[in-house]
């Protein structure tokens, strides 16, 4: 996790919201709503989307006239370079009856990486997801499940509000729950306890 922690982005007057990932499973629709919310800030922000070349070709036309810049995805070993250019890291899920059972209890592999960067995180997705509950309870991200909440979050993120405490909470959570070596120790101890009590 230490490799994901880096210097804060230098203020440029424009807040860079960064999303790195696929646009399938209707995620592009949620990202479009985020871009529309950013547009309402009158030039104070831009959404940088890092995704596959095929996804760019397939979905870019849906983002016309919106403050969005598309970039080709980078290999995972270089993803930290993308994160460090961000002012805000974006994660989104969509309400889908078809995929509801899958997403309800899942946590994207990007979440621990986002938490470790100590940068503000914007989550936009359904409230009934365990991920929503997890991030909200630990006070590590700005959360929105509806357009009105989303606009409020975006407005706060492009303002001069200080999110230092939230970002430090995120880093602590990453180290507590998402460190591979620590989790290996916890698993070993759990197995040892079971064996001793059997």
Walk through the language-model features, giving the residues of each:
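A charged, aromatic-enriched C-terminal amphipathic alpha-helix characteristic of glycosyltransferases
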Residues: 145-151, 161-191
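Conserved acidic donor-binding segment of nucleotide-sugar-dependent glycosyltransferases
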Residues: 108, 126, 137-148, 156-161
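Short alpha-helix at the nucleotide-sugar/activated-sugar donor binding site of glycosyltransferases
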Residues: 115
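A structural motif in glycosyltransferase catalytic domains
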Residues: 17, 30-34, 47, 150, ...
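Conserved donor-binding/catalytic core segment of Leloir-type glycosyltransferases
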Residues: 10-28, 35-38, 167
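Nucleotide-sugar-dependent
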Residues: 26-29, 77-81, 89-112, 121-133
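Acidic anion/phosphate-binding donor-loop and adjacent secondary structure
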Residues: 1-14, 161
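Nucleotide-activated donor-binding/catalytic signature segment of Leloir-type glycosyltransferases, i.e.
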Residues: 14, 42, 46, 51-88, ...
């Amino acid at each position: 996790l230490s490799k994901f922690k880096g210097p804060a982005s230098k203020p440029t007057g424009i807040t860079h919201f960064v999303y790195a990932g696929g646009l399938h499973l209707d995620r592009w629709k949620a990202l479009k709503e985020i871009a529309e919310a950013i547009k309402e800030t009158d030039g104070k922000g831009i959404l940088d989307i890092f995704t596959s070349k095929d996804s760019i070709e397939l979905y870019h036309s849906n983002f016309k006239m919106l403050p969005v810049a598309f970039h080709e995805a980078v290999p995972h070993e270089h993803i930290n370079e993308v994160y460090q250019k961000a002012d805000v890291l974006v994660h989104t899920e969509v309400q889908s009856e078809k995929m509801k059972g899958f997403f309800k209890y899942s946590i994207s592999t990007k979440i621990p990486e986002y938490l470790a960067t100590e940068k503000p995180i914007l989550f936009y997705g359904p409230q009934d997801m365990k991920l929503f509950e997890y991030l909200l309870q630990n006070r590590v991200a700005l959360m929105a499940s509806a357009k009105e909440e989303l606009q409020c979050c975006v407005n706060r993120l492009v303002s001069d509000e200080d999110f230092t405490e939230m970002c430090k909470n995120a880093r602590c959570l990453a180290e507590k729950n998402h460190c591979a070596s620590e989790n290996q120790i916890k698993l070993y101890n759990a197995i040892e306890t079971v064996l001793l009590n059997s």
